[in-house]
Amino acid sequence: ARAMRFFKPDPVPSELIEKVLWAATRASSPNNTQGWDFIVVTDPEVRKQLGDLFLPFAERVSKFPDPGNDTDRRTLKGAQNLGANMGNFPCIIFVCGRNIYPADNPREPFMYSAVYAASQNLIVAARALGLGAAFTTLHGMVEQQIRTILSIPDEMYIGTTIPLGYPDGPEGPVSRKDISEV
């Protein structure tokens, strides 16, 4: 599914949020542990607090040198928009995980395999419902502040940050390498 990094300000109905979360929870997980949690942020004040944390990222990206090709320019523009407008997007979903598998010796790679599968399902479902989403790990730069704002306990890992909304831009197919090249 194509990553969408530009969104209209229109709110996402709770029914659609529930549908993408349902799809996310159909993902595979080690031994069917389903060790994921979803934090959905739609409150404008909380979104603004979170958005303010990402502004320095947008500023930093704005100073990157011109990459020299249109594809990379679009990617940089999208990344800058994510940082500059995260707080303006109608919905932000944090896909979190609990390190619970195997029970006798939990290891992070197992937890992330479930979180990333759930995140991908969420994004594909969003596209099928006419929504846009982007898989990001921007939270890594400001994780402690996010944990404080959202009261996320230390034993819960933040795996992905997914802005969700109605696309405001191209919605065409993704361009990928031919199968023979991978």
Report each predicted region and the residues it spans.
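A short beta-loop-alpha structural element at the N-terminal edge
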Residues: 11-15, 41
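Glycine-rich phosphate/pyrophosphate-binding beta-alpha loops
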Residues: 26-33
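Glycine/small-residue-rich phosphate/adenosyl-binding loop
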Residues: 34, 40-115
